[in-house]
Amino acid sequence: MPKGKGRGRPAGRTKKKKKRVSDANGIAHVKSSFNNTTITMTTSGGDVITWASGGTTGVKGTRKGTAFASSQAAVQAAEKAMEAGIKKVEIWVRGPGSGREAAVRALQSTNLEITGIKDITKVPHNGCRPPKRRRM
């Protein structure tokens, strides 16, 4: 292949077109682990509109798992969802992390109307053996 020739990729970052949704209803998926919290805003059909996490708010390291980082991520995701045209949201919470309550409270403080909160954490009926306990 001759030098200097591109391989079909654009030279710079391309500007992404903002999505507008026709339906004003959406779902806020709050996935909270001990290390991080991810908030994904989707349409009621499941198409992703936007997402935010503890890391996208500018927090690094172990502080990504804190309640503060998850509340910042929830506000960030809610603002982007409102720009896309979402007005009502149902919150689905998953995981054992510390940021789940803070994320729900932060979503309630925004201008989004909360239609319901559902806990969809998966609980094993004695499935796989958990990892051994940490000794400090």
PLM region descriptions:
Residues 1-136:
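Ribosome-associated RNA-binding proteins
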